[in-house]
Amino acid sequence: MAHQAHSYHMVDPSPWPIFGATAALLTTSGLIMWFHYNSLYLLTLGLLSMFLVMIQWWRDIVRESTFQGHHTPTVQKGLRYGMILFITSEAFFFLGFFWAFFHSSLAPTPELGAQWPPTGINPLNPLEVPLLNTAILLASGVTVTWAHHSITESNRKQAIHALSLTIILGFYFTALQAMEYHEASFSIADGVYGSTFFVATGFHGLHVIIGSSFLTVCLLRLIKFHFTTNHHFGFEAAAWYWHFVDVIWLFLYMSIYWWGS
C-alpha cells in the first residue's frame, strides 16, 4: 500500500461480475428448461460455468487479501457493512415467501377447500425428518462457533476439526432434504401449498449449499495457513451467513412444517 496515500482498495478491472451474471442467466434458464422440457443440458452448462467463475473469483480475492495485503482495517470494515446489508436483503427475500405462505394459509379460499393444508394435500410429519434436520443445523451452528473460537485462540487443529464437522453436517442436511423431496406425496405443481413449500424450503436448501461451499473454501484456506487470530474476515462472513441460514430454517420449521401441517 506504499504507493498510495489512503487505506482503501482500488479494485482492478475484473471479468468475473459479467461472467457470473451470464452463468446465473444460464442456470435460471436451465431450471426453466428442466421444469418444462425435462432437459438438463442448459442447467448443467450454467452450473459448470458458475462453478468455474466462483473458483477464479475466490482465487483473485484470496490473492488480493492474503498475499497482496489489500484488505486493510478500513477495507475490512467496508466488507463487514457489505455482508450485514447482504444478509439483511436475504432476510427480506425470505420474508416474501413467509408472506405468501401466511396470506394463503390464514384465510384459505374456497378453491383450497376453505382449509389448510388444502384438500388432498398430505403434509410431511414435522416430528420426523424435519425435526432431525433442525437438530443437524443447530448442531452445525455450535460447531461453526467452536471453529471461530479456535481460530481466535490459535488452536488450528481444533478449528480444522470443527469446521470439517460443520461442512459434513451441512451436506448431511442437504442429502436429507433431497430424500424428503423425493418421498413427498405432493409436488411444486400441487397448488399454492406445493408452490410455497418447495420454493421456500428449496431456496433455503440452495442457501445451505452456498454456505457449505463458502465454509469449504474457508477450510481449504485454514489448512493453507491463510487465517490469523485477528485477520480472518473470510471465515467470519461465512459464519454469519451460516447462522442466518440456521435462523431462517427455524422460522421455516415452525411455520411451514409445524404450524402449517
From Swiss-Prot:
GO terms for molecular function: cytochrome-c oxidase activity. This is Cytochrome c oxidase subunit 3. The keyword Transmembrane helix applies. The chain crosses the membrane at residues 16-34, 41-66, 73-105, 129-152, 156-183, 191-223, 233-256. It is a multi-pass membrane protein. Belongs to the cytochrome c oxidase subunit 3 family. Its EC number is 7.1.1.9. Component of the cytochrome c oxidase, the last enzyme in the mitochondrial electron transport chain which drives oxidative phosphorylation. The respiratory chain contains 3 multisubunit complexes succinate dehydrogenase (complex II, CII), ubiquinol-cytochrome c oxidoreductase (cytochrome b-c1 complex, complex III, CIII) and cytochrome c oxidase (complex IV, CIV), that cooperate to transfer electrons derived from NADH and succinate to molecular oxygen, creating an electrochemical gradient over the inner membrane that drives transmembrane transport and the ATP synthase. Keywords: Membrane, Mitochondrion, Mitochondrion inner membrane, Translocase, Transmembrane, Transmembrane helix. It is found in: Mitochondrion inner membrane. It is an enzyme of class 7 (translocase). One of its GO terms (biological process) is mitochondrial electron transport, cytochrome c to oxygen. Gene3D superfamilies: 1.10.287.70, Cytochrome c oxidase, subunit III, four-helix bundle. It comes from Struthio camelus (Common ostrich). It catalyses: 4 Fe(II)-[cytochrome c] + O2 + 8 H(+)(in) = 4 Fe(III)-[cytochrome c] + 2 H2O + 4 H(+)(out).
